Amino acid sequence: MPNPLFDALFAPLAGQDRPLLHLAGGQQLTAAAFVALVERLAAALQALGVAPGDRVAAQVAKSPEALALYGATVAVGAVFLPLNTGYTAAEVDYFVGNATPRVFVGDPADAAALAPVCAAHGAQLMGLSAQGTGSLLDLAAQQDAAFAPVDRTGGDLAAILYTSGTTGRSKGAMLSHDNLLSNARVLADLWRFTPEDVLLHALPIFHTHGLFVASNVSLLTGGQMAFLPGFDLDAVQAALPKSTVMMGVPTFYTRLLDDPRLTRDRVGHMRLFISGSAPLLSETHIAFEARTGMRILERYGMTETNMNTSNPYEGDRRAGTVGLPLPGVDLRLMADGLPVAEGEVGVIEVRGPNVFQGYWQMPDKTAEDLRPDGWFITGDLATRDADGYITIVGRAKDLVITGGLNVYPKEVEEVLDTLPGVAESAVIGLPHPDFGEAVFAILVRAKDAEPDLAAIRAAVDARLAKFKQPKAYAVVDALPRNTMGKVQKAALRQSYADRFKA
């Protein structure tokens, strides 16, 4: 019986005694043991009454058992719904109410807070701890190891992943077996993954990057993973000499650069470093190459689409760009309903087998963002150069319109980030009585120097047109970010909303 995602990612592991997961404590889990765990968890889900199409929500710490729960959900034909482990019970209430999962798997330590939420929405609460214990594992241990996956088609839903955006209510992106599998196959081929690879996996698995990119690609190609519970600098440094590929967010790379242990010898066994989920500063790209001799490969994707573009494996990996559209993915830049010229800013729209099926229980929002002919309006602004490379310049929602003129925050941020005393910056638009919106810059002070605002104003005046220059500045120790490192500009706009009020 076909079950596309299970057949491609999990079934081939059966009977293989090779290591699959290398854990932080030095333990290993073989491929055969892992798939046996998947099958027992699948039987446990069926024992709980989970039927094809039901949702299984998981708010659990990263562990082999948590990854196996994903496989088990796929195996029974249900829809996997991973949730950020940082959400409070009050926040979880929205997701459980919206998705109405049959089963909610949470940390046993949070049971008292989660129980009323699950009861209110008819979800059965089961426990799974970071140590691989809890009521779900107890039930799985009672099940027969033999399990036959449930029939599914490529168009059936495999997951609902809620957007980790920086504005508004999270939306549940519905992803099919074909959405996930087509993207994993393209990336595995493009990035040259083989069974000989060892992926250094320090990402969370409640997000598309850690689960549907990193884990799916590695499982698909039969490699191994150094499966770390999170980014711990010592653990990552220890794993680097034994790994071949690392996927990370920009923060991973800046932390590595701050550590003198990062040397060419340390990464001598590595063939590829990949970055995504948030913009990688050109300075980080350049500094990493200078230190290690290796150029980070940056790519671009979204919860709704998985990956859309990538810098090439062989060829020019251009700092500041997210590369070229993936094979099979159509990408266009639009403004006022028309394609923009080369070098002009437009909203990215994509179409391809990776594009999601719509937003769960949000038909109006789906119709707004997903055209009938398959084009998805991403809301990201970008330019395309003569060679086809895409450069993200920001979110359409972050565009500042001051006195009727458009200001793209990234252009201003790129100037500010090069100035003495500035570690990084965020530029936003704030309500202004004369201009409608005014450009406002939040500067993160550098470790070794305080920003000199007079000098910064002079430097900006020499490099940017008057209308692009910040009307005022704030200096802070850090910017607010979501779990994947994206700056939360909506929070900044709220914090400074009254700055220019008359």
Sequence positions of predicted segments:
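Conserved pre-ATP/AMP-binding loop-to-beta segment of ANL
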Residues: 17, 143-162, 169, 192-198
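Conserved AMP-binding/adenylate-forming
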Residues: 27, 43-87, 406
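Conserved AMP-binding A3 loop
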Residues: 30-32, 158-182
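AMP-binding/adenylate-forming catalytic core of the ANL superfamily
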Residues: 87, 104, 352, 357-358, ...
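ANL superfamily adenylate-forming
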Residues: 109-154
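Conserved AMP-binding/adenylation subdomain of ANL enzymes
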Residues: 181-198, 206-245, 259-261
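Gly/Ser/Thr-rich phosphate-binding loop
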Residues: 243-248, 257-317, 330, 337
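Conserved ATP/PPi-binding loop(s) of AMP-dependent carboxylate-activating enzymes
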Residues: 324-328, 338-369, 405-407
